[in-house]
Amino acid sequence: MSPIGPRSFSGCSCCMPRRRFLGTVAAGIAGFAASQAAAQVPAPSPPSPSPGLVIDCHGHYTTEPQALFAWRKRQIASLNDPAQAPRPDDLKISDDELRQSVEGAQLKLQRERGTSLTIFSPRASGMGHHIGNAATSEAWSRVSNDLIHRLTTLYPSNFVGVCQLPQSPGVAPANCRAELERCVKELGFIGCNLNPDPSGGHWRDPPLTDRSWYPIYEKMVELDVPGMIHVSASDNPNFHATGAHYINGDTTAFMQFITSDLFRDFPTLRLIIPHGGGAVPYHWGRYRGLAQDMKRPPLTQLLRNVYFDTCVYHQPGIDLLTRVVPADNILFASEMVGAVRGVDPETGQSFDDTKRYIDGASLPEEARRKIFAENALRVFPRLAAALSARNAPSGTPR
């Protein structure tokens, strides 16, 4: 995502009838629910979504109303005088403002590009964990997550929530357990974003495999929710946020996993590395060789717990990803409206219209179905239940 700041996005505010979408989702998750009831096992087999179901596992709220930026600006200005800090309930944003913020952007693009729904979280670069202290992050995360919840309530057919965690440099991630539990149990969220570097590009905290992270992993396993490894804004001028810091975070996380026994300790923990896995697929041979030289298990063992998304913005990149990484480990994603918003002059299409690349890849239909929907339903076990609970019409129709 681009650094936090107001964005405008114009477009049509009308919506298509909700009935068609709900029918698609209901058909898509029917096999999933049936398999759970019949098998009664904690790790269900992948569901069998109906043709056309497309789940975008990586979307951020990047078209926020101006009032949210004003609240955050007040919060940052009060860091030296906490008595002046705004309270969460000082933020006043109407439902109409929320609708206006997404109807001409995310919802319009969902309709145009054929995406069924988006797993939605606060702006990644806006998490700003390097700003202030743990109390700052706690208040900011709560405000940000509550807005996502309101959007998922207004548009239950379009958005399902994933939470921002109140991480802070030098603070053990155990402090994030309460917000994660609140978001999952009270707000109906189905996952979280984990920042491997809350310092914003200075990498001062322990790696993701350090035992200081174990309390949050224990809570994730208890709640049966996955995490997406996602850095926030860069506070280091050496690293452009979306062009360097993001890809560095993705690649660094994968190498940390190779050199650790994290998944021996948490065999059911599921972690998603976004942006196509950073540099990992391109250097797959390097990582296989390093694992071998270090007497670590083969990468196929790591893939029991690690997944990659498709936020890769050209056809050759997606072709490489799908040739190197098994289809079972790839989740469809676009990150729209996100890091790259322009039109590719070579194709005449938007860079972030990633569904076109999956459609254009040389894949068997079974693999395409897995990437578009089946894998998301498997990696996010709470997704099917969340969608089933939302079949009753409410809010503004799609």
List the model feature ranges, each with a label.
Residues H60, D197-S199, S232-A233, G277, ...:
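Catalytic metal-binding/acid-base residues of hydrolase active sites
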Residues P65-A70, G132, R204-P206, F239-T242, ...:
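Short aromatic-enriched loop/helix-cap "lid" or pocket-rim segments at secondary-structure transitions
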Residues D261, P267-Q301:
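Aromatic-lined glycan-binding groove of carbohydrate-active enzymes
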